[in-house]
């Protein structure tokens, strides 16, 4: 994925040091766009191994309208664990449990999970119930009935509920576009963590194009990724530099193995074929 490596190189060369809500400064630029052709390949990063299982389960979690991490941790996906844990640490029920002990309680105690493992009205809630509107279902119906519409938009940015969210939406708004028999999507992402988050976001929204295209009897077209604050955390700079020394490998393919509704898809209905990658590179998330 040359587009991603070009982004990383650009931010290393042009980014300005900025403070933020976390304790780790960033190199940041404002305004950057990438475009991925989804016609014959899938944009999953090859210069390090990316957790495909986490990408798929997180997207299905969004689509279901879920906001509780129990579904994720039950399926071995731990990308959201830190946020509810930080909230739990502020509660009177906290007894110095470690993060690992917290997650074990989420897995084994349904009442505990209901009380402490919810992230608030984050992505899934907004996609499926934005002040009473099922945006995802509505936009899919609109694609079918009025494909030339310029209002094929889903927003995760709900100002009336931001304070209730564990994390304000980073990927905040997306728009579909139909041209002949192809479906494209443009994402506006207000904040992009280039090392950890952006590779996930690229793959997640590309997969969303595949799923919605399948649902609407269209073919995948393009994924356009527009970033607002595109940044590299200072503790990820060496990892990014390592990636830039690696050769991009041929991209994989994605095969959808079911004709069921997008709202009924499971992990086993989605197959990743031919994913070759360089070794995993660890980086710590900034909470």
UniProtKB/Swiss-Prot annotation:
DUMP binds at residues 21, 150-151, 190-193, 201, 231-233. Disulfide bonds: none annotated. Keywords: Cytoplasm, Methyltransferase, Nucleotide biosynthesis, Transferase. Belongs to the thymidylate synthase family. Bacterial-type ThyA subfamily. Homodimer. (6R)-5,10-methylene-5,6,7,8-tetrahydrofolate binds at residues 51, 193, 286. It comes from the Bacteria. Its EC number is 2.1.1.45. This is Thymidylate synthase.
